[in-house]
Amino acid sequence: MSTNQIILTDQGDNYVNVWSHVAQDLYNHYGETLYNSWFSKVNFIESSLNTVILCAPTNFVRDWIKSKYSMVILQLFQHYNNTIKSIEIITKELPGTTQTVTELPTKTFADIGSSELNSENIFSTLDARFTFDNFVVGAPNELAYAAARAVAESSGAVSESNPLFLYGGVGLGKTHLMHAIGWYIKQHNPSRKVIYMSAEKFMYQFVKALRNKEVISFKEKFRSVDVLMIDDIQFICGKDSTQEEFFHTFNTLIDNNRQMVISCDRSPSDLDNIEDRIKSRLGWGLVADVHSTTYELRLGILESKIEQMNVKIPKDVIDFLASKIVSNVRELEGALNKVIAHSNFTLKEITLENTQNILRDLLRSNERIITVEDIQKKVASRYNIKLSDMSSSRRLREVARPRQIAMYLSKALTPKSLADIGKKFGKKDHTTVMHAIKKVEELLENDIELREEINLLMKILQN
């Protein structure tokens, strides 16, 4: 049992106190703006039969919290009281004690003392929305997902993927997988000490420890864990002192068979302004990339989110979002949330026309939209072949492979059907395009160099 968990068995004032802790955690995690928008007017009403009852000020706030934050709130309550099994959010207050938490002090890094530096609690740094159960798996992320799952399920032993290095563009799921690892371990192996934090926060805590002469405490905190997860490691590029400390922390953990998980926006070999000895170590274990989403994966993500939020969205709207919002998962989910929120606020039906109007600014940025012709030109230039080779029937490998890659990218980055794509490649039929896509997907499973090449092409085309 975690030493910082508060176990309460009675009701009344104790639960009011727990709600105060939960509210503080929500404030710390989501920030002042979001907290004031959704949580500041929520009241604790009572607890009954292991259920906590909260009161929201309006039906809309109630429904929004239920759809997006109910699991977060439940897990926070369970952190302080493991007898709580569910929460209920109502809009009509019941008789009894109520507690509203409205103004909470912001806790800055400067306020963190040595006792907090040594805290084993990672709960407040994990987002309960990010679990393995709600991670949608597809060809672009299946290796990263399988590796993350293996790390989480290693039951105290170090996985073969040590360190596990996840890399890819913004909003593609790297952070989701790291949070999922943390949640899984805390739920199934609560005795294991886990730390998750960004590389930026790692640096700030190191600087703070130097300033306050608490370096020993800092080293003990990070070198005594069972699992250390550092997000966005590219942040330490060019920061020599932080790199030095990270290097020794890395060595200590690996030498003691402790697991490390690291994320980055590029592969270890592409990192600049970082020591070669660190770059080499980052590639010791499994390097798994999370590349840009396909139409099918975007469709699956949308359907999963819609099911979680228990809303009804017309099929043509879902298809439109999956076809048009191609940059990353974060932007895709944000677009869906914006459409739903607009409908709730205005009480207007969700239609394709309304969706196009609501998202017109976002669509404009995505509509630098990549055409099949753009892809053909870029791939032909990249592989030094003639543009006319894209529509030819030449079977030479140096021509056929770039053509297959261009077909794969056309499916991933445009809303065109297989038949339409085939027409752009010398009037080839849809089965030829399907074969090309399948061939590239098979190659991507084992060819790291090809994955990096396609990721680079996607970034060039999208930017």
Swiss-Prot record:
It comes from the Bacteria. SMART domains: AAA, Bac_DnaA_C. GO terms for molecular function: ATP binding; ATP hydrolysis activity; DNA replication origin binding; lipid binding. Residues 83-124 are annotated as: Domain II. GO terms for cellular component: cytoplasm; plasma membrane. Keywords: ATP-binding, Cytoplasm, DNA replication, DNA-binding, Lipid-binding, Nucleotide-binding. It is found in: Cytoplasm. InterPro entries: AAA+_ATPase, Chromosome_initiator_DnaA, Chromosome_initiator_DnaA-like, Chromosome_initiator_DnaA_CS, DnaA_C, DnaA_dom, DnaA_N_dom, DnaA_N_sf. Residues 125-343 are annotated as: Domain III, AAA+ region. GO terms for biological process: DNA replication initiation; regulation of DNA replication. Residues 344-463 are annotated as: Domain IV, binds dsDNA. ATP binds at G171, G173, K174, T175. Residues 1-83 are annotated as: Domain I, interacts with DnaA modulators. Gene3D superfamilies: 1.10.1750.10, 1.10.8.60, 3.30.300.180, P-loop containing nucleotide triphosphate hydrolases. Its main location: cytoplasm. Domain I is involved in oligomerization and binding regulators, domain II is flexibile and of varying length in different bacteria, domain III forms the AAA+ region, while domain IV binds dsDNA. Oligomerizes as a right-handed, spiral filament on DNA at oriC. Plays an essential role in the initiation and regulation of chromosomal replication. ATP-DnaA binds to the origin of replication (oriC) to initiate formation of the DNA replication initiation complex once per cell cycle. Binds the DnaA box (a 9 base pair repeat at the origin) and separates the double-stranded (ds)DNA. Forms a right-handed helical filament on oriC DNA; dsDNA binds to the exterior of the filament while single-stranded (ss)DNA is stabiized in the filament's interior. Belongs to the DnaA family. This is Chromosomal replication initiator protein DnaA. The gene is dnaA.
